[in-house]
Amino acid sequence: MRFFRLPGVYVPQEDTALLLEAFSRERVDHGAAVLDVGTGCGVLAVAAARRRARAVAVDASRRAVLTTRLNALRAGVRVRAVRGDLLTPVSGGRFDLILANPPYVPVRGGRRPLRGSGRNWAAGADGRALLDRLCRGVPELLRPGGVVLMVHSSVCGPERTVKALEKGGLTAEVAARRTVAYGPVMRGQTPWMREQGLIGAGDVRDELVVVRGEHLT
């Protein structure tokens, strides 16, 4: 299926594909509750619904929410797409699987834009402005036996994500890796990231990772 995308909505890229592959390896029972955080075009949410899950998609962008609803309609599946800040719209909910592809690119000044395409990728001075919030909030939303899959750049420190999830009571590990060439966004931040020591002088490729956390019964 070719996904429709309104202007300004995050374009599915290598991180989307890596997370989708990791998701395909997870067991999804009929009627399982699956949450897609930072849904963008709704690729992961639609994939979950196709596996007969009860899919909920969250994004801060109105256009992303509308895009996801339209793509679910085109795919002939049901997805509940809601607008809001990370996990806030699903506070108090419980899920069997949580998928997250949050903004993770470090930016000079550390501020996240309130609007515009930069909101799709800018994530503070160390790229963890949203990752750390997710790590703190995810454990209480997972049912016993539930799993979280979170994709981000190795620049953000996969070990920090693992430790943060473990602090929340989950078992955690890096479940998938993929090395890709820097895209336009990362290339734009390269000089500053080199100044900050976030990447090496000769680095021109990025390692994407999927961190898997599980709420053991």
Label for each model-derived stretch:
Residues 1-51, 64-67, 88-89, 191-217:
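SAM-dependent Rossmann-like transferase core, predominantly class I methyltransferases
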